[in-house]
């Protein structure tokens, strides 16, 4: 099973530490006017023009990506879904946070999908063996789907609001 990749915007000190002898020590994403360029570990870097992002562990991204209280992005990031265009999350941007909690939670959407109000996001099996569906009450694009807890299962869905 493949999962999307997430890259966090690197500070100047992180950029300096990301190279050794002109080669990348981490997987990097360079965003410039010419487009996106992914550099794997050991690739020759050359001259970097644009913003540099460092790949992070996707499953742990909810810890540093968003503020659950305010619903805003804490650190700029780029998510590369399995298919479709990249998703840019900018620091300070407001996002929708939707939580699914139950004995067994099965996500029904993938990162990059566009959802509208009423769309099923997850199937939830309760402790009483009932099947319930979590539906979206907003329209937007799925930017992140991640599991937070194992028992009971807890998933977080991050949606970027759709601009009308």
What are these regions, as identified by a protein language model?
Residues 1-164:
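Well-ordered secondary-structure scaffolds
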């Amino acid at each position: 099973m493949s999962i999307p990749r997430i890259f966090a915007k690197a500070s100047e000190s992180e950029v300096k530490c990301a190279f050794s002898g002109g080669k990348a020590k981490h997987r990097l994403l360079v965003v410039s006017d010419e487009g996106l360029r992914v550099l794997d570990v050991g690739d020759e870097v050359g001259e970097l023009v644009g913003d540099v992002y460092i790949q992070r562990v996707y499953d742990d991204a909810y810890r540093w990506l968003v503020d659950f209280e305010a619903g805003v992005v804490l650190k700029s990031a780029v998510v590369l879904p399995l298919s479709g265009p990249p998703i840019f999350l900018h620091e300070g941007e407001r996002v929708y946070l939707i939580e699914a909690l139950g004995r067994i939670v099965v996500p029904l959407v993938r990162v990059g999908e566009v959802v509208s109000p009423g769309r099923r996001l997850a199937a939830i099996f309760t402790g009483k063996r009932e099947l319930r569906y979590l539906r979206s009450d907003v329209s937007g694009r799925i930017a992140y789907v991640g599991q937070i807890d194992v028992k009971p299962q807890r998933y977080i869905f991050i949606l970027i609001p759709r601009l009308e």
